[in-house]
């Protein structure tokens, strides 16, 4: 029956379907949780459970207030997190073990014949025809579901056979990023390391490690809390798509803009984060380093040469290596950059503990000082309280003002050799020639002086800052050499030079470099970088492009300042319980060291990628290099590093089971671990033993097992 308005009607039809919607949001209980994925957000979610199943989730907004002047941490969460509940029940998620049917049929047949598991597995892998047949089935369908016990038996049989026949160093274990789920990471790696398998590094899962953090700052990717972004008043975002990869923190970006912060985005494409940019720098992919070098050139010229910036110079003197003296090595009619001047060089300080690891500065009166804070103070047997960065002489305890540059205090100008790598290879993908172009030498003068060592020798020295000025191409005073005349001179590393590399206007490089430093001067360091894997995927990304960012920050006094800093974000590589984590996962309570290996080298050699790497290393050598390697390929350099003990590689010994090698050492009369080590070293020296890397394709030197868990090795 319908009323006259035609809007309502009375019906006898069932309305039971409404119960579905009423029950949709009912639940038995809720728990507080997060999502153990490879991100650093750690977002808090309330997970609602019904009949033992996750039915829905809700973002929580009860984070503690950090500071009344900083926006709330919430809202937190992202599209990936809100869909996480679907994954446990996805039809695409395997619920049971699966084995290639071809392999399982062979194994089941051998087991039925009365062989034990190890014998059954051995009879398959040592049969060339059957081994080839089951391996050929890879990459196709043809899985067979087996029980958990059956799968465990097959895996254990394979491991036992591999250890007995080839050695535990023929088994590799790979799993990415421990911090996203510590227990599962530890369990797998502990088991592997108790067996003596290869403990593969995990950072290469997505790109290179940011070396600059360790080499410049002494620790690995220590980044600020994301709420600290809000305090930054000048942002440069490079290689990090914040909205996409740090969604839960992206609100600080928009909030900082409301506060008046300026956002500069270095991105070849109009990415998600680019829409927030006040200045978009659409540079050629992989040319970030060139652009940043031009910014450094501008900062050095305008804030160190054209005028003195007290905040910058005070910061650089106290917190960087720029005032340290560097030896210049004579090379014909020019000089090459050498090592730092050490305390062991100077009679007054030569008796210091760890003198080779303590460095020297000078002041305006020409006096040499041993400042506190060098790494040698960190490892003194008896702490002296000098492991800090105060500008005090560690011996006399007097404060001093170090010279940042010798200009005006020099007794000579030294012509120093630098290498120009501009045209060594073409960054356009697919166009890199195999040989490339060698680096070109250019000569630039730096102010220098002579000092006398404790053994009576004379050293020509300059400061690290003077070398940086010359490297960046910043002309000063009467210094001669191949310096550019101005910003429009296309010599390294001017704004005009970067224009040819990046496709970006020189004016835009001048603008960003000037604004970055001007903001840092006025705010005492509140200029920051947010950076990530978009840069690290390139050949020199993690080492050189990142270094340019770090140098800009150091020159402008931004590191260690709220609202400043070098902020590298990728995933959750840090573990809060690191001491326990390292001991448990590495099984260090049982034996040490574990067989650690960088995964890049493992794949490079064991998948034959080195055969397809046709780039010679001509482009890598400095023009001052005196002796080049006999061979000129990355594989040769890797092999050299292994032979010299710089880099572990497994399997380790050519066509040799390390367990059998130990037995041979005992037979030879070795009674202690040290005697075994000495005996093995002697076998290598005599040529009776060789490293497996030199014949990595030999069947005896190939990996026999690779275990992958917690990650999609190929797909991601």
Where do the model's predicted regions map?
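Flexible, glycine/charged-enriched surface loops at secondary-structure junctions
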Residues: 166-170, 306-313, 523-528, 560-569
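A glycine-rich phosphate-binding loop feature that marks nucleotide/adenosyl-phosphate handling sites
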Residues: 176, 314-319, 515-516, 530-534, ...
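Extracellular/periplasmic catalytic domains that process cell-envelope and extracellular macromolecules
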Residues: 228-230, 521, 697-702
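Short acidic alpha-helix initiation/capping motifs at coil-to-helix transition points
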Residues: 444-446, 485-493, 544
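Gly/Pro-rich turn-and-neighbor structural signature
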Residues: 164-168, 181-182, 498-533, 543-550
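Short glycine/threonine-rich loop-to-helix capping motif typified by GTGT followed
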Residues: 181-187, 537-546, 576-585
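N-terminal export/assembly segments and adjacent metallocofactor-ligating motifs
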Residues: 1-459, 466-474, 493-496, 505-508, ...
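Oxidoreductase and adenylate-handling cofactor-binding alpha/beta cores
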Residues: 554-558
């Amino acid at each position: 029956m319908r009323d006259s308005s035609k809007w309502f009607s009375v019906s006898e039809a069932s309305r039971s379907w409404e119960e579905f919607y009423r029950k949709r949001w009912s639940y038995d209980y809720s728990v507080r949780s997060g999502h153990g994925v490879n991100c650093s957000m750690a977002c808090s979610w309330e997970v609602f459970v019904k009949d033992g199943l996750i039915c829905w989730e809700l973002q929580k907004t009860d984070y503690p207030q950090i500071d009344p002047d900083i926006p709330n941490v919430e809202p937190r969460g992202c599209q990936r997190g809100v869909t996480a509940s679907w994954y446990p029940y996805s039809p695409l998620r395997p619920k049971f073990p699966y084995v290639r049917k071809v392999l399982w049929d062979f194994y089941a047949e051998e087991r039925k014949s009365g062989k034990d598991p190890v014998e059954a597995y051995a009879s398959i892998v040592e049969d060339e025809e059957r081994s080839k047949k089951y391996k050929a089935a890879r990459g196709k369908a043809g899985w067979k579901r087996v029980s958990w016990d059956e799968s465990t038996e097959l895996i254990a049989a394979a491991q036992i056979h591999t250890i007995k026949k080839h050695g535990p160093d023929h088994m590799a274990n790979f799993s990415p990023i421990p911090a996203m789920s510590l227990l599962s990471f530890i369990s797998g790696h502990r088991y592997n390391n108790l067996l003596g398998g290869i403990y593969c590094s995990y950072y290469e899962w997505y790109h290179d490690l940011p070396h600059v953090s360790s080499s410049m700052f002494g620790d690995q990717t220590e980044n600020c809390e994301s709420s600290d972004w809000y305090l930054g008043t000048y942002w440069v975002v490079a290689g990090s798509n914040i909205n996409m990869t740090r969604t839960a923190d992206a609100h600080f970006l928009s909030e900082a803009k409301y506060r008046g912060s300026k956002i500069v985005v270095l991105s070849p494409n109009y990415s998600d984060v680019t829409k927030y940019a006040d200045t978009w720098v659409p540079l050629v992919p992989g040319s970030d380093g060139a652009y940043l070098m031009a910014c450094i050139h501008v900062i050095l010229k305008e804030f160190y040469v054209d005028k003195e910036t007290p905040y910058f110079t005070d910061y650089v003197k106290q917190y960087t290596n720029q005032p340290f003296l560097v030896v210049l090595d004579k090379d014909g009619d020019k000089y090459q950059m050498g090592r730092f001047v050490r305390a062991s060089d100077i009679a007054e300080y030569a008796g210091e503990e760890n003198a080779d690891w303590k460095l020297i500065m000078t002041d305006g009166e020409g006096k040499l000082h041993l400042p506190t804070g060098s790494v040698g103070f960190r490892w003194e047997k008896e702490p002296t309280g000098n492991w800090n960065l105060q500008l005090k002489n560690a011996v006399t305890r007097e404060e001093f003002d170090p010279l940042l540059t010798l200009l005006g205090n020099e007794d000579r100008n030294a012509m120093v050799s630098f290498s120009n790598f501009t045209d060594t290879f073409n960054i356009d993908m697919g166009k890199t020639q195999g040989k490339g172009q060698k680096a070109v030498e250019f000569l630039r003068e730096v102010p220098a002086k002579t000092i006398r060592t404790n053994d009576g020798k004379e050293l020509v020295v300059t400061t690290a800052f003077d070398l940086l000025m010359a490297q960046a191409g910043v002309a000063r005073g009467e210094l001669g050499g191949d310096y550019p005349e101005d910003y429009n001179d296309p010599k390294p590393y001017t704004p005009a030079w970067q224009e040819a590399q990046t496709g970006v206007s020189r004016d835009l490089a001048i603008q960003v470099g000037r604004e970055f430093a001007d903001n840092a001067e006025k705010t005492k360091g509140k200029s920051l970088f947010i950076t990530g894997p978009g840069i690290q995927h390139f050949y020199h990304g993690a080492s050189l492009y990142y270094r340019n960012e770090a140098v800009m920050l150091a020159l402008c006094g931004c590191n260690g300042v709220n609202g400043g800093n070098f902020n590298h974000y990728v995933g959750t590589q840090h573990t809060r319980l690191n001491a326990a984590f390292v001991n448990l996962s590495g099984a260090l309570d049982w034996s040490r060291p574990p067989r650690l290996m960088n995964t890049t080298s493992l794949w490079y050699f064991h998948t034959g990628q080195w055969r397809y790497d046709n780039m010679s290393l001509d482009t890598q050598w400095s023009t001052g290099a005196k002796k080049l390697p006999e061979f000129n390929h990355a594989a040769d350099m890797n092999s050299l590093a292994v032979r010299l003990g710089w880099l572990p590689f497994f399997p380790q010994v050519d066509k040799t089971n390390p367990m059998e090698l130990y037995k041979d050492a005992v037979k030879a009369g070795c009674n202690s671990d040290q005697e075994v080590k000495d005996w093995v070293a002697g076998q290598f020296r005599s040529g009776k033993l060789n490293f497996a890397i030199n014949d990595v394709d030999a069947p005896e030197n190939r990996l026999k097992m690779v275990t992958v868990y917690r990650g999609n090795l190929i797909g991601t």
